[in-house]
């Protein structure tokens, strides 16, 4: 059963800390929000959007990411990340994601993240070598 796309939305707020910087996560040499951390925050928003509709024993896994990191955020900056369903077929969910600076409203990143709903046990059984 497909779920109404406008129902699957989530917005999360974060403050950039020292451990979130490109320098700290190894993706650069500057003390600004690192792209890997920003992407993790955006994925967390997609997970939060899907959580209320997942059946017991199910979870979702990321399968595709297309994100542009458009602006730098210093330590102490507030960042709001949002995910909104753009497409779903019951298993596959494509989200439009964005991040903005909470003080200025400036768009920091935008793109799409795709997740697929899977059975937790069956998925993990396939990962055993």
Predicted regions mapped to residue ranges:
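Catalytic strand-loop segment that frames the active site of acyl-thioester-processing enzymes
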Residues: 1-34, 51
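Intrinsic-disorder/low-complexity, polar/charged segments enriched in Ser/Thr/Lys/Arg/Asp/Glu/Gln
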Residues: 5-11, 64, 78-80, 92-94
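HotDog/MaoC-like acyl-thioester-processing domains
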Residues: 7, 74-75, 85-129
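Generic structural detector for well-ordered beta-strands
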Residues: 13-17, 68, 114
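Residues at secondary-structure transition points
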Residues: 33-37, 74
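Hydrophobic beta-strand-centered segment that forms part of the acyl-chain substrate-binding groove
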Residues: 47-80
């Amino acid at each position: 059963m497909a779920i109404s796309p406008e129902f699957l939305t989530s917005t999360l707020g974060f403050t950039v800390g020292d451990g979130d910087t490109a320098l700290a996560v190894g993706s650069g040499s500057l003390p600004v929000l690192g792209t890997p951390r920003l992407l993790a925050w955006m994925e967390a928003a997609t997970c939060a959007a899907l959580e209320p509709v997942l059946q017991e024993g199910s979870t979702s896994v990321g399968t595709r990411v297309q994100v542009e990191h458009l602006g730098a955020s210093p330590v102490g900056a507030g960042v709001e990340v949002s995910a909104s369903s753009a497409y779903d077929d019951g298993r596959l969910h494509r989200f439009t994601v964005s991040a903005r600076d909470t003080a200025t409203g400036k768009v920091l990143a935008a793109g799409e993240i795709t997740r697929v709903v899977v059975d937790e046990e069956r998925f993990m059984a396939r990962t055993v070598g």
